[in-house]
Amino acid sequence: MSDEDHDFSHQGGGDNASKTYPLPAGALKKGGYVCINGRPCKVIDLSVSKTGKHGHAKVSIVATDIFTGNRLEDQAPSTHNVEVPFVKTFTYSVLDIQPNEDPSLPSHLSLMDDEGESREDLDMPPDVALATQIKEQFDSGKEVLVVVVSAMGTEQVLQTKNAAEK
């Protein structure tokens, strides 16, 4: 399920808002999202076994954690509900990169959205190659756009974008 397949308007707000919603396992689609072991994951493969003597077809799910990239697998009867995370993506311009006082910790990012709202609560991504790419683009004076993904109470920079792709 792509983001276009979901209506996120019923999510609600605040800390008490649900971070997931139920969906029958048989309705999952490749490219959609699912929670496995309490982690938000993107489905990379699905297979459905035939109905057995106990009456339920089983859905085998192979997915990757959207924040760590770890591969996870799960199975569920096709008629049973699985938890699907609300996943939102945002694009921000990088205004500044501030080194952390502790060099063993990631630098902080100053970001601005399309409406001019700024935020300074995100760190550089843990992916060293991505963090290096952001820093090099920023240091060269180019406009750096980052894509932030939010799911299940976690937000993280997952990629960069060219300003022309905005």
From Swiss-Prot:
Positions of the UniProt region annotated as Disordered: 1-21, 101-121
Keywords: Cytoplasm, Elongation factor, Hypusine, Initiation factor, Protein biosynthesis, RNA-binding
Predominant cellular place of this UniProt entry's protein: cytoplasm
Record has RNA-binding as a keyword: yes
Modification sites for Hypusine: K53
Subcellular location: Cytoplasm
Membrane is among the record's keywords: no
Protein modification: Lys-53 undergoes hypusination, a unique post-translational modification that consists in the addition of a butylamino group from spermidine to lysine side chain, leading to the formation of the unusual amino acid hypusine. eIF-5As are the only known proteins to undergo this modification, which is essential for their function.
Primary role: Translation factor that promotes translation elongation and termination, particularly upon ribosome stalling at specific amino acid sequence contexts. Binds between the exit (E) and peptidyl (P) site of the ribosome and promotes rescue of stalled ribosome: specifically required for efficient translation of polyproline-containing peptides as well as other motifs that stall the ribosome. Acts as a ribosome quality control (RQC) cofactor by joining the RQC complex to facilitate peptidyl transfer during CAT tailing step.
Protein family according to the UniProt entry: Belongs to the eIF-5A family.
Protein name per UniProt: Eukaryotic translation initiation factor 5A
Species annotation: Leishmania donovani
